[in-house]
């Protein structure tokens, strides 16, 4: 059996398109469950999902009041009955063979503990030419057309569509924090990948388990959207370094902060003279995110959450 965990927050329009692709899987319905985790939505998500329960016996509605994708995914993982977990975003279209292909990768190599899946961007309208180099930043993932395995840290997982054995997920403490209230403070699913890489876990690649990630050009494919991704990545990078230092503001952290502040000042001036240089502008946003993390550390309520090594086993 395999469990699909779908966090959602006010994403009803996307969920209406995405959820039917999970009902259309080639696996028999008794061999998989779909757990929709409602993360405090104020739209009609609950009514929509509950209206489907009588027809789809493998569908489960779960409410998670603590905001953040990490918290929603963890709630779903605790609820899951299966040996294998699949984490999927609510704004994707998934091919009918998706779950069967993930299981095929596990069954072909019993040492495999996690599976990366193909993710492609599906734009609502034609995207601008300049966006091409940044598709990986938006989650596009492709390691080729053949099933492969790697334990040399060459494969990454993306929370849009990924799988992991439940026992491994629990042993490693799940995902790292991402949101605390309105604040992004951690590295979420990337932090979990780093845990797998730290022990050179065997990760499989399922090229035929596919997600088409529905994206809006006006939002995700805009210069502001890419800049926000870079800014958030900067916060996540600083969190990862802080975690590596055992959550101590030691000399390494202070040196990192000072260097990042100097880079921000330098690149800010450069951007004034090169306002159309997107690469330079996005790099500035990432370094600003690096610095912003330290401002978040000044908030006592955030600092307590940030310094938890294992947020999965804290209920």
Question: Over which residues does each language-model region extend?
Answer:
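Short aromatic/hydrophobic "clamp" motif used to bind/position activated sugar donors
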Residues: 85
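Glycine-rich, basic loop-to-helix element that forms the pyrophosphate-binding segment
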Residues: 64-80, 101
